[in-house]
Swiss-Prot record:
Pfam families for the chain: Abhydrolase_1
Compartments reported by the entry: Cytoplasm
Family to which this protein belongs: Belongs to the peptidase S33 family.
Gene from which the chain derives: pip
Described purpose of this protein according to its UniProt entry: Specifically catalyzes the removal of N-terminal proline residues from peptides.
Entry keywords, A to Z: Aminopeptidase, Cytoplasm, Hydrolase, Protease
Name under which the protein is recorded: Proline iminopeptidase
Organism: Neisseria meningitidis serogroup B (strain ATCC BAA-335 / MC58)
Amino acid sequence: MYEIKQPFHSGYLQVSEIHQIYWEESGNPDGVPVIFLHGGPGAGASPECRGFFNPDVFRIVIIDQRGCGRSRPYACAEDNTTWDLVADIEKVREMLGIGKWLVFGGSWGSTLSLAYAQTHPERVKGLVLRGIFLCRPSETVWLNEAGGVSRIYPEQWQKFVAPIAENRRNRLIEAYHGLLFHQDEEVCLSAAKAWADWESYLIRFEPEEVDEDAYASLAIARLENHYFVNGGWLQGDRAILNNIGKIRHIPTIIVQGRYDLCTPMQSAWALSKAFPEAELRVVQAGHRAFDPPLVDALVQAVEDILPHLL
C-alpha cells in the first residue's frame, strides 16, 4: 500500500433533512479523481482506505455513507436506500467540481459502484471492483440464513443464532430486524454485536475469534439488515446484471478472492459472464481487502487501469 497521507480538504455535506455525510480529499489536488466506496452497508471508511492509491497521482475522495462512520446521525436507517446513496455520490462530485472519476468499491461497495455507474455512466472513467456482491436474495441467504456459509462454521453460527428464539430461526434476517430496531437499546446492541461478530469472522482468510464493540457494530448490523430486508431496493435478482449494457464502454477490473466466504466467487463469475469486457482477476485470498494478496492485487489493478483514465 501507499503512504497514508492526511486529507487536505474535508467536511460534511447535508444530503437530506436528516443526513449529513462525511467527505474528505487526500493525495494530489490536481490528480486523477477517484472515489472510494466502502462496504457494509454501514461499515464506514478508515484512513487505511487511502493507501490503495498513489497520493502523487490521484485526488482521493472518500465518503462515509449515510448512517455510518463519521456521518450523522449514526446508525440511522431512515431515508437510507441504495438510490439515496447514489444521489449522495453525485452531490459530492458536483460539490467538488469533478467531471468524471474512477470509482473503486468492494463488497457492498461493488454493488453501489455498479448502481452508480449504471445511473451516471457519463461520470465514470473506470471501475475497480472487489469481492462482488449484487445484493441478490441468494447472497443474503448465503450469509445470514441456515444452509449457506453456516455449514462451514457451525460453531460460530451457533453464536449468531443465539439471540433468536428457536421458533423464529427459519427466517433469521427478519427476526434480527426486530431486535436491531427494538426500542430497548440493550436489545439492539446485543443483537448488533452478534451480527457483526459473525461477519467479522467470515471476512478473514484465516479466521480468528472476534469480539466487536457493540456500539461500533450497530451501524453495520442495523444498516446491512435494513438493506437486506428491502432487497437493496433493486428490481429483481438480475437488476444490476440486466443493466450492464449501460456501462460496457467503461474500463473495468474485477478483483475476486477465490476463497471469499462473505461474497463468494459465484457473483464475480456471474458479473464477468454478463460483462465480458471487464477483466476478472482471481486471487488466492478471502474477502478482507487489507489481506496482503488482495492489497497487492488492488494496488496493481489501480495502476493498470490508470492509462485508460488519462
